[in-house]
């Protein structure tokens, strides 16, 4: 569904930009009743705020810092030194004035180069008059192959609407860093704020993470919320839109993130190395353009670990989830990774090592897809374990969660924590032994199992299975439609199915289906078996705009639909 919405909204991109520009020129939310400009709550001032560290290149010798001030501050600089020395070095920032939907501010960025590896530094930012408090950072040591980082996702907050409260993620991260003081940086899997095109949301996020990301590099992945906005937020948010690029994200963070992404889509796409690991960060836009860059990027690294992030899970836990938004394009680079971290679904899950939609046992055989839960206490109520998941936790308690990733040479351990310290999953990958713990063998079935979006149709399909005859796959399709909430009428020699605004009538002994789009000729005749009418999988799927595949190694057929609508058969009210 997101891909369809994306295509439609991309067509409206230019129109939306014009609307936004006009809105900004009016300054509707920055003018009082007397026509005077005023600052919003949490707006920029002469004192630096939104201070944040990031890796911009080689973490052994480089570090980037960003901050924000009001426009009265015409220039800025960072003043830094090695801890234990008094010799301060000043580096002037590059800066740019930005008019957002509610404010006008000057944004500052500095990339420090020529630093010493494994060295602690102290720094302040601002201009000659208005300085920040002192913060610290540490560069990566030489020959580092033992380190840890924390990954979080979906810590966005939409309320209170005009002053969003990000204290949940801030509280969680402060606790996590007290629990794991050895962590080197924070990594995210997207949805860092609720509406990334709106300034007040970033104000909330920076307020929540104050006291953390000034001294801990914060490497973000964009999610759909980071990419969206509202034309106006007052008195209530109206005019929701998505842009072709995560414009405000790219503006704020592109200057401090590695400038090595695909042309036209840097900022939200980048890669970096730390220790013996390579990190590939994938934005949600233009996957067909991002994919060649991503694959080429991975071919160039010789790091032991290849870790990636992409907000939308390829193998979802949502009952309506689907993966065709980007996977057809991104499959090639993603299958080069050891782990792909995702978010979006606000629960935890991880897959068996997966490649070509088949499930394996050994980490060398595929990519582990790891959904990181949520860092903001934002819960979903209908998530469930799918056939491709070796581990799952619904996370329906209103508190945040995070994952600690520890790398020690050829061994990686990912430990998933609730905010209060309870552990709900531990995964270890040992490259030397080609072993993934805890032990979990990927299923292989004797009868060809049937699943829809990863949900096994076991209860309704007991003792039923798909069959292959003369190279054609057949299935009791009425059972599939019943299982997903569609309408099914079974009569002596016919089967009527209705779902997703389509319908079809299948008849025993016929290779033709009567549908809402006319007569469809199928690759085989419908037949009775096991008290069900079996019809060809290929044509029946196409009639209902579904996709399907047969995972040969595991012997199951999975149907999918690009729609995230739920075709529930509701009881009539009249």
Residue ranges of model-derived segments:
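Conserved, compact domain cores that house catalytic/ligand-binding motifs in diverse enzymes
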Residues: 147-221, 226-227
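Acidic/histidine-rich helix-loop elements
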Residues: 86-103, 151-170, 196, 234-243, ...
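Acidic, histidine-bearing metal-coordination/catalytic regions of metal-dependent phosphoesterases
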Residues: 2-159, 178-179, 408, 415-445
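Stable alpha-helical elements in mature extracytoplasmic
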Residues: 165-172, 189, 201, 205-208, ...
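Extended active-site neighborhood of metal-dependent phosphoesterases/phosphodiesterases
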Residues: 109-112, 120-141, 200-305, 329, ...
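Active-site neighborhood of phospho(di)ester-bond hydrolases with catalytic His/Asp-centered motifs
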Residues: 151-153, 185-191, 218-224, 282-283, ...
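Outer-membrane beta-barrel translocator/channel fold
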Residues: 316-327
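Primary recognition of N-terminal secretory signal peptides and signal-anchoring hydrophobic helices
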Residues: 437-574
């Amino acid at each position: 569904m997101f891909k369809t919405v994306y295509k439609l909204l991309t067509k409206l991109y230019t129109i939306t930009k014009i609307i936004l520009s006009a809105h900004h020129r009016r300054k509707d939310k920055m003018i009082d009743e007397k026509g005077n400009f005023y600052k919003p709550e949490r707006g920029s001032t002469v004192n630096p705020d939104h201070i944040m560290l990031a890796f911009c290149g080689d973490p052994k010798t480089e570090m980037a810092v960003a901050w924000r001030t009001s426009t009265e501050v015409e220039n800025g600089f960072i003043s830094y030194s090695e801890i234990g020395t008094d010799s301060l070095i000043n580096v002037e920032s590059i800066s740019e004035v930005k008019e957002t939907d509610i404010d006008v501010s000057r944004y500052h960025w500095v990339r420090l180069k020529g630093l010493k590896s494994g060295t602690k530094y102290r720094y302040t930012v601002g201009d000659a008059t208005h300085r920040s408090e002192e913060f610290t950072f540490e560069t990566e040591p030489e020959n580092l192959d033992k380190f840890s980082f924390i990954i979080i996702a979906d810590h966005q907050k939409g309320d209170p609407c005009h002053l969003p409260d990000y204290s949940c993620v801030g509280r969680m991260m402060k606790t996590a860093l007290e629990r794991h003081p050895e962590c080197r940086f924070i990594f995210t899997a997207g949805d860092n704020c609720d509406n990334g095109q709106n300034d007040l949301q970033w104000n909330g996020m920076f307020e929540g993470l104050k006291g953390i990301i000034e001294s801990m590099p914060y490497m973000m992945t964009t999610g759909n919320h980071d990419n969206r906005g509202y034309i106006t937020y007052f008195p209530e948010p109206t005019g929701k839109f998505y842009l072709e690029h995560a414009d405000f994200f790219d503006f704020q963070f592109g200057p401090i993130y590695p400038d090595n992404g695909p042309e036209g889509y840097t900022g939200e796409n980048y890669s970096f190395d730390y220790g013996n690991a390579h990190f590939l960060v994938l934005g949600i836009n233009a996957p067909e353009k991002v994919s060649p860059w991503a694959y080429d990027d991975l071919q160039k690294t010789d790091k032991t670990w290849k870790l990636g992030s992409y907000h939308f899970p390829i193998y979802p836990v949502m009952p309506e989830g689907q993966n065709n938004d980007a996977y057809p394009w991104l499959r090639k680079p993603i299958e080069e990774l050891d782990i792909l971290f995702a978010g979006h679904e606000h629960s935890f899950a991880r897959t068996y090592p997966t490649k070509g939609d088949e499930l394996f046992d050994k980490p060398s055989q595929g990519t582990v897809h790891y959904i990181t839960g949520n860092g903001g206490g934002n819960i979903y109520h209908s998530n469930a374990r799918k056939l491709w998941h070796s581990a799952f936790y619904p996370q329906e308690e209103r508190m945040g969660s995070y994952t600690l990733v520890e790398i020690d040479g050829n061994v990686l351990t990912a430990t998933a924590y609730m905010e209060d310290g309870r552990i709900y999953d531990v995964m270890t990958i040992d490259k030397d032994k080609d072993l993934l713990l805890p032990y979990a063998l990927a299923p292989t079935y004797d009868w060809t199992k049937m699943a829809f979006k990863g949900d096994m149709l076991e209860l309704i399909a007991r003792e039923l299975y798909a069959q292959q005859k003369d190279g054609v796959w057949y299935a009791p399709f009425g059972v599939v439609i019943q299982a997903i909430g569609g309408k099914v009428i079974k009569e002596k020699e016919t089967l009527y199915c209705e779902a997703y605004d389509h319908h079809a009538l299948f008849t025993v002994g016929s290779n033709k289906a009567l549908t809402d789009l006319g007569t469809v000729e199928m690759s085989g005749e419908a037949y009775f078996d096991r008290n069900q009418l079996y019809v060809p999988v290929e044509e029946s799927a196409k009639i209902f705009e579904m996709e399907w595949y047969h995972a040969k190694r595991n012997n199951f057929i999975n149907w999918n639909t690009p729609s995230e609508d739920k075709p529930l058969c509701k009881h009539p009210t009249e």
